[in-house]
């Protein structure tokens, strides 16, 4: 079987330049979608360093569109830890504090888990919310998913060798044995990731260099992040120089200096 295509690789001189370009891309994608046939923009976010990156740059990047445009945004989360929203590990909680307070997206269009439910019920509840928001789609089709990648090659809460990598029926799955704490999580599955119109992986720092070489150069297709191959959508990688330092495959170098 042929190795999967790695997608377009863009390398930036610093995380700050990466973040500014990422925010502009999100704003451009939103504007394009709002002008298109569907008339809405569905964005899926991941946690980690992306929270501070988007909180710093996205409000200014989206400001020219005006506050009324956010009424047609739908925001979901690619995975979530089963913790209260005020917990330091809550992805939604961090975005609520640092980003959503600056963007007038209606609360009803921000799709979250119910952390009070058992993990299996929380996954089913989140799947129901997604199906309601994406009526007409057999599998929810996000306009843009922003994903991270761990040093082990995991993305969302899909970990190497885990049975969830074989899930084909559920759009959202519970995980009760995450090798990375906290152990109970809810995650989008590969069918949803691969149905997206656009997927951007974001990785910064030397700690990601080795796994990025495995994915993008050695093409280790069994790693979860390498299994994200949108069927009809675009796949891009946004890296800083430290994360890209081991790559010899072609990439686009960007700098605003």
From Swiss-Prot:
Pathway: Carbohydrate degradation; pentose phosphate pathway; D-ribulose 5-phosphate from D-glucose 6-phosphate (oxidative stage): step 2/3. Belongs to the glucosamine/galactosamine-6-phosphate isomerase family. 6-phosphogluconolactonase subfamily. PANTHER family: 6-PHOSPHOGLUCONOLACTONASE. This is 6-phosphogluconolactonase. It comes from Rattus norvegicus (Rat). The keyword Transport does not apply. GO terms for cellular component: cytosol. Keywords: Acetylation, Cytoplasm, Hydrolase, Phosphoprotein. Its EC number is 3.1.1.31. Hydrolysis of 6-phosphogluconolactone to 6-phosphogluconate. It catalyses: 6-phospho-D-glucono-1,5-lactone + H2O = 6-phospho-D-gluconate + H(+). SUPFAM superfamilies: NagB/RpiA/CoA transferase-like (SSF100950). GO terms for biological process: carbohydrate metabolic process; pentose-phosphate shunt; pentose-phosphate shunt, oxidative branch. It is an enzyme of class 3 (hydrolase). It comes from the Eukaryota. Pfam families: Glucosamine_iso (PF01182). It is found in: Cytoplasm. One of its GO terms (molecular function) is monosaccharide binding. Its main location: cytoplasm. The modification N-acetylalanine is found at residue 2.
């Amino acid at each position: 079987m042929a190795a999967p295509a790695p997608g377009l690789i863009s390398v930036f001189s610093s995380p700050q330049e990466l973040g500014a370009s990422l925010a502009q891309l999100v704003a451009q994608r939103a504007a394009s979608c709002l002008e298109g046939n569907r008339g809405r923009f569905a964005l899926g976010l991941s946690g980690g360093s992306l929270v501070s990156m988007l909180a710093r740059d996205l409000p200014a990047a989206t400001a020219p569109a005006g506050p009324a445009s956010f009424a047609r945004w739908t925001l979901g989360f690619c995975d979530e830890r089963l913790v209260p929203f005020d917990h330091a590990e809550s992805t939604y909680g961090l975005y609520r504090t640092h980003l959503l307070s600056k963007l007038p997206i209606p609360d009803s269009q921000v799709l979250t888990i119910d952390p009070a439910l058992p993990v299996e019920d929380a996954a089913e509840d989140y799947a129901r919310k997604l199906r309601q928001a994406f009526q007409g789609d057999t599998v929810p089709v996000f306009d843009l998913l922003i994903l991270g990648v761990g040093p082990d090659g995991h993305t969302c809460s899909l970990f190497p060798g885990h049975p969830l990598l074989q899930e084909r029926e559920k759009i959202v799955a519970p995980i009760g044995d995450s090798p990375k704490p906290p152990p109970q999580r809810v995650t989008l599955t590969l069918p949803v990731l691969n149905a997206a119109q656009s997927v951007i992986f974001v990785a910064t720092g030397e700690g990601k260099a080795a796994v990025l070489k495995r994915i993008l150069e050695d093409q280790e297709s069994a790693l979860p992040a390498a299994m994200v191959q949108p069927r009809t959508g675009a796949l891009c990688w946004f890296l800083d120089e430290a994360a890209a330092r081991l790559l010899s495959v072609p990439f686009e170098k960007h700098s605003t200096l």
